[in-house]
Amino acid sequence: MKNNWWKESVVYQIYPQSFMDSNGDGIGDFNGIIQKLDYLQNLGVDVLWICPMYASPLVDNGYDISDYYKVNPIFGTNEDMEHLIEEAQKRKIKIILDLVVNHCSDQHEWFQKEMKDPNCEEASYFYFRTTENDKEPNNWRSNFGGSVWSRLPDGRWYYHTFAKEQPVLNWECKELRQKIYEMIHWWLEKGIAGFRIDAITFIKKDLSFASRPTNDGELYPVEKLTDYKGIGTFLDEMKEQCFDKYNCMTVAEAPGVDDAAFERYAGKNGYFSMIFDFGWENMEGENDKSSIHAVERWKKKMFTHVAHNSGIGWSAIFLENHDQSRCLNKFLERENISFYSASALASILSLIHI
């Protein structure tokens, strides 16, 4: 019987660049994390979520990965990473990593090979289009602004959900999926206890690539491009071939997954152990600068979610993450920020399910 150990675990997120610098170069590193393991253990931490530490040009804070098997040398060596895993295990602390497989860096070997030879095998790992009028293939918008399409010197266009330096991976390609699964196994065999899976609801595309209707002045087309029909085929396969073989924790960053889709993602037979529900995020961005109103909106959304999904599956409750401002600044006026107001917000994480 599967032991859902993560249900009883306290997870601590570490952004390695700013966490602890062990050698005085101004950048956090693996040895710095090792130095703080006893402190983290005393805090009651069971799991460390370490944000991207892979080889990367750092265009998007490490979410643009140029080599899934190598760590970024600014943090140390692969041996240092293995030492961190070992030292954490001695203290009964598990480590989960970011898994970024919707896209990679344009400096990744796969994309670089395609740039040299458009007929190579790796060309099928990405989405390329040509147009007759020199205009973008459609009106889809990047999450970072502008078109999802960038043009190559030879006139072709390649697809990117986020920055132009992050070409999207083509999950329709079986050979690519196997490469991804091999990498997942490699890290799990190293002793990693699971993954926080980045932008996973974007991996299935509308292969018609037809333009979508838009609202005047809106950044994105009206019809969503996340959790697209057919995505379950890929997610079930990844779960069966990778996650089910290990008693690991998986938490999906799941924009576009509403309460109606929650069970598919985090239910008893869901694709993942749990999800981050982004229905609660960015309350301060709704044309209302009143923090009191922001709290009311946030509370309503959270309570609705918990009431709907209680007993269906597991959802990671959070107040902020690395993509958002600090919750104290989000929900409180400056003069009201104190130990007591911070404690009141923090108590929500523990009491929401009681």
Predicted regions and their residues:
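Active-site and adjacent substrate-binding regions of carbohydrate-active enzymes
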Residues: 1-352
